[in-house]
Amino acid sequence: VNNVIIRRATLDDVHAITQMHADYSAYANTLQLPYPTEKTWEARLGANDPLVTQFVATLDNVVVGLLVVHQPAQIRRRHVASFGITVSQAFQGKGIGSELMQVMVDYCDNWLNVHRIELEVFAANGSGLGLYEKFGFKQEGILRDYAFRDGQYVDAIVMSRIKSKS
């Protein structure tokens, strides 16, 4: 999708982010509970946690995606980051996830000095697995019965990307 702008998320984005996460497809592949409130997102965006960076993807000034990058508090794991991505259902499959991934990789590699980016993805999330593999993530293992979703336990796959030495 052309004309996508990726920028830091602000408190002005709370309503749009809440609306995006009100859709089943937005939270089904995350560990978020359904029906988040604006207060929940306001607290997250207003926390000013130096180890958490949040970006939004906008198209024609409408928020269509969210990227959250986390760094661990443990000093000996500061070379690691994890992340979460959400794309509005109407814009899934249009390259916005790839644009957010590119921003995340650049941010981690060139600004945070991150050596290892790690994630957990539900085993049934084929589009997520494909996206992460496209960006060089490798599967490391399976977390059996990792989360409870839609009335059943589901597995997750652990993946990571180690920054190349070049």
Where are the regions a protein language model picked out?
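A short beta-loop-alpha structural element at the N-terminal edge
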Residues: 4-19
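Acetyl-CoA-dependent GNAT
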Residues: 8-11, 24-90, 101-102, 107, ...
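Conserved active-site alpha-helix within GNAT-family acetyltransferase domains
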Residues: 94, 98, 110, 123-141
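Conserved GNAT acetyl-CoA-binding A-motif
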Residues: 109-120
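C-terminal "cap" of GNAT-fold acetyltransferases
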Residues: 122-129, 145-166
